[in-house]
Amino acid sequence: MQDAAGRDRDPAVEVERPRRPELLIITGMSGAGRSTTGKALEDLGWYVVDNLPPQMLEPLAELTARAGLTIPRLAVVVDVRGRTFFAELTGALAALDTRHVSPRVLFLDATDEVLVRRFESVRRPHPLQGDDRIVDGIARERALTGELRARADVVVDSSSFNVHQLGSLVASLFESERDEDLRVTVMSFGFKYGTPADAEHVADVRFIPNPHWEPDLRPLTGQDVPVAEFVLAAEGAGTFIDRYESSLSPVFDGYRRENKRYATVAFGCTGGKHRSVAMAEELGRRLRRDGVPVRVLHRDLGRE
């Protein structure tokens, strides 16, 4: 057996085929948020090509599938500027199907009233209006894209969204495909050294009896089992950590919806050696159990 260059190839050696990237076509009504959607996907780690002529879809898909290129997720923003563009886009999608490339189509839409208002606010004509009114251009575009909208995998009506809300919606639709989930830092600290400025959430655990006053525990830290058991067995400590963990869950969900990548939760005690350390370790353990990417940091441990 020979390779593409005519050289003999060992038939026992399997040549890995190039892995085709996931392909998403972003199209829809002008002014409905195609570019905003593309930018949101870029933030999620997609490789985005904006305003690509439809006839370039097939060559681009082939290029990114070549060995050595690492573009696992490709999004292409395509608009329809006339009957020719629409025919080229439908033809390109059909050609991709014959090559066993099955792109998803995301169609952006909005009401006529909203689209008119958006074009008027930026003082730009609709690409299909010509010498007519904006609403006439919108009507022409709707007639051209009706079939494409019907075959779309996802249709998003952006009428009630601003730019940030649309970006958040796109992120929620594709959040399982993100390169990074929300990453949480759980920190312990001592109040006598100051409250950490970068913590979104600060919990004061000085209500727990201080192991410092227990001779056997004083030289140990909250990372040691005897201290951790002492702290977690204290009256109110178990209830506190249960409720605190539960209160953070909807907060973290909200952060993910807002595309926030990092969060810091801090526990403080007097010196940052016993109680705060034990509680930080416990919350970190629970978050890991729930699949949350987390690191535990003890800011002031060892300062005494």
From Swiss-Prot:
Residues that hold GTP according to the record: D79, V80, R81, G82
Residue numbers binding ATP: G28, M29, S30, G31, A32, G33, R34, S35
InterPro entries assigned to the protein according to its UniProt record, in alphabetical order: P-loop_NTPase, RapZ-like, RapZ-like_N, RapZ_C
UniProt keyword terms in alphabetical order: ATP-binding, GTP-binding, Nucleotide-binding
Pfam family, one: RapZ-like_N
Record-level Gene Ontology MF annotations: ATP binding; GTP binding
Organism domain of life: Bacteria
Protein family (similarity comment): Belongs to the RapZ-like family.
Function: Displays ATPase and GTPase activities.
Name this polypeptide is given: Nucleotide-binding protein Krad_2934
Species of origin: Kineococcus radiotolerans (strain ATCC BAA-149 / DSM 14245 / SRS30216)
